[in-house]
UniProtKB/Swiss-Prot annotation:
The chain crosses the membrane at residues 14-34, 41-61, 72-92, 135-155, 172-192, 210-230, 282-302, 316-336, 351-371. The gene is sstT. Gene3D superfamilies: Sodium:dicarboxylate symporter. This is Serine/threonine transporter SstT. HAMAP family: Ser_Thr_transp_SstT (MF_01582). It is a multi-pass membrane protein. GO terms for molecular function: amino acid transmembrane transporter activity; symporter activity.
Amino acid sequence: MYKRYKDVSLILKIVIGIIVGAVLGVMVPSWSFIDVLGKLFVGALKAIAPLLVFLLIMSAISKYRSGAKNHFGTVIVLYLSATLFSSIAAVAVSYLFPIKLVLPGAMKIAESAPKDLGTVVTSLLTNAVANPISALVEGNYLAILFWSLLIGSGLRLTSAVTKKVVTELADTVSAVAQNVIQFAPFGIVGLLHESLSKTGVKGVMAYGQLLMLLVATMVFVYLVVYPFMVWLMTRQNPYPLTFWTLKVSGIPAFFTRSGAVNIPINLKASKDLGLNEESYAISIPLGGSANSGGAAITVSIMTLATANTMGVHVSIFLALLLCFLSAISATGVSGIAGGSLLLIPMAASLFGISNDIAMQVVGIGFIIGVVQDSVETAVNSASDLLFTATAEYADDRREGHPVDIRAKVKAAGKGTAEVVTPEKANEAEESEQV
């Protein structure tokens, strides 16, 4: 029974959940027992999210390899830069178009809104070095991020077996989180019923404004910010490659809503472009967890919308801090459907917003997630391919072997690009040395 339920498209189930929740919220707002479904769903997410974030970041950091003969260094710089620039763009858009949400039962004042720079820094440092076990139990995401980065760095020195164990643990917890997310339609019924019964249709309409802001920002980043980065690296027209990656990778990712599922598609597309197999065989799978520009946008915009709703003044310093925090914490979630939403409590804690309030916003995220998560995944997955190709073309340009990107894209579309295997790359390198 569960297998048959799981085989049904999550998007279809969520759409049905939205319709059922909306109908029940309007027709029978007094049936408060329906709200329990939302509470159970949010409670399960609240329980699994800290462990999931901890293991994913730790696993991603432990896989970093240095010294390999590939374009890995350039790819990493592009991945991290793209995620950071995405977060900055999201914060800028949030300042230009501030949005307030309607949260049932939420007070308009944060628990402990930071008052000055000294208080913020002291609080951040104190929270970051908290006991890691307590952090997992209490949901202290700043400490979770800090310790996962340190432990992940330490794991780089361990054996492959140890790293495999950590990866398998992360995969196991991810599978548990995926099973919880499978029940999102039931949770959405409860959450939407509660929202409609307590805030009315007007409150729910604010979610549409939030969705439009999220999607518009992601489109702007992929069609303006990312192409500018490609141009800076290659000094060629970036749009043939940008649109091609969007077509071959972004469209499939939009419907699968999973960067991990899209990895084989990106690997084939890299081969079609004639990229170095030794390079893309590493960067594409890593991009499934390390390149999360779409996730950074979601975390930044939804966190600032929460801060606006709670009446928290966001200074320039805190906004910049949010950019870095969103960029770092987004590492590891692009391969999970709805994974970025689980990072909102960590980002919200920066402004003294309680975990309970933040999880209400996570619930809103799942309501709009049919579109938001699909667009986010498309941006993340397509940019994995975009920056993998850009890194190789940029390195070739620096070495005095510029590549005609438009011709490469055209050849890839016809399936006539020359494939660069590790053996061919080594032969070319040896001939240059001679």
